[in-house]
Amino acid sequence: MEEYQVYLELDISRQQHFLYPLIFREYIYGLAYGHYFNGSIFSENVDYDNKSSLLIVKRLITRMSQQNHLIISANDSKKNQFWGYNKNLYSQIISEGFAIVVEIPLSLQLNSSSEEAEIIKYYKNLRSIHSIFPFFEDKLTYLNYVSDARIPYPIHLEILVQVFRYWAKDAPLFHLLRLFLYEYWNWNNLITPKKLISTFSKSHLRVFLFLYNFYVCEYESIFLFLRNKSSHLRLTSFSLLFERIYFYGKIEHFVEVFVKDFSSTLSFFKEPFIHYVRYQGKSILASKNASLLMNKWKNYLIRLWQYHFDVWSQPRTIQLNQFSERSFHLLGYFSNVRLNLSAIRSQMLENAFLIKIVMKKLETIVPIIPLIRSLAKAKFCNVLGHPISKPLWADSSDFDIIDRFLRICRNLSHYYNGSSKKKSLYRVKYIFRLSCIKTLARKHKSTVRAFLKRLGSEKLLEEFFTEEEEILSLVFQRASSTLQGLYRGRIWYLDIIFSNDLVNHE
């Protein structure tokens, strides 16, 4: 009965757009507690029951409610200090509770109409990792120019909070959220982007991710709207993106002049459409048009960040390159387009001649050095790539230890299965296998050689050596016509069922 009452209370709060009372409900932090300690494949199964208590969380929330959070000054973080116990642990749990509550108005607005439901369906497809990989494989080889850029972080947290203010109709919730963030980070001065990125990467607060996604969503809503409008310009007389930076001005006279005097120039801008891909904080712009058009989009992005979001970005941070000249880093891969030269001998009557054909081929390579650095940070190996044991896992059973290593190894294998060269992937598998063996040997207080000799490595770790094709996975066959007939290849990215945590350490 209590469970139904909880859902009824949540539904009433959604309908009334008044979420402030939910902040002080204990069950919210019960949900947050479970989410926080089960959110990553690299999480340690430590007994947190001795370190935390929902009663303490409730006291902290009650103490927050007794403060004057409707008025915030620069010195509030010194006067209103309510952290007493395990600061990192309880701040994480409270932030998870805040994230659960502040996500409610977003889900309410997105489900309020069929039109908005279509919008969120479009954006889900746009941001799906299963749609990015096929885009790279199918489209990238036909494009000429790529511009990769990291979306700049706001210089101050207040920018993120104000973006959320546009959506939230609950003023007390907005002020309490701001108070919590000021208390947690002790924001007396402006935070530099370097410090903000460092804080974000270390804490991984869900509420910060939520606010940052709001910030990125607003940026993309403006940029993609203009991009979609520009793609339709070629269907009318407004086919010019030439010298256009401010998109809201009237350009009838502009088009008339250029069509009359520079008609020969318009052939370069018949298709101003560009492709946009974004994963986490990095975005890629790609086009098959001239570099001049891509430079115009680059300048527009910089002005959009500077004037609309008050975020400073240097023009050199967005680099424009040809695919054949430079590789780029996205989704944990190093990717580039390589030109393959081939010669075909053709004979016509008595004359024979050679035809040279240039074909583009997409190459995706696993960046082994950043990956080993991430594995070293997760304590699977040292900085040189030599496998080490996991002492925190040595207290588990043999089956649990093998299952943990096997699960992580399979997730990474599925994620990097699209690599053109498998040598780096084999090295990663070797690190996990030997790290697993060393952990088991540490548990049984034996050397690796003696442990393998006593138990037998083949039977104990046979699942590690199982071929990927024999593992039950979501694999379909894709047919493509080639010169040799019908080729059946694996759609490898459908195997990805878990986000790659190591991509966050790029």
Curated annotation (Swiss-Prot):
Keywords: Chloroplast, mRNA processing, Plastid, RNA-binding, tRNA processing
GO biological process: mRNA processing; RNA splicing; tRNA processing
Pfam (any one): MatK_N
GO molecular function: RNA binding
Record GO cellular component, one term: chloroplast
InterPro entries (alphabetical): Domain_X, Maturase_MatK, Maturase_MatK_N
Top-level taxon of origin: Eukaryota
HAMAP family according to UniProt: MatK (MF_01390)
Physiological role: Usually encoded in the trnK tRNA gene intron. Probably assists in splicing its own and other chloroplast group II introns.
Full protein name: Maturase K
Organism: Spartium junceum
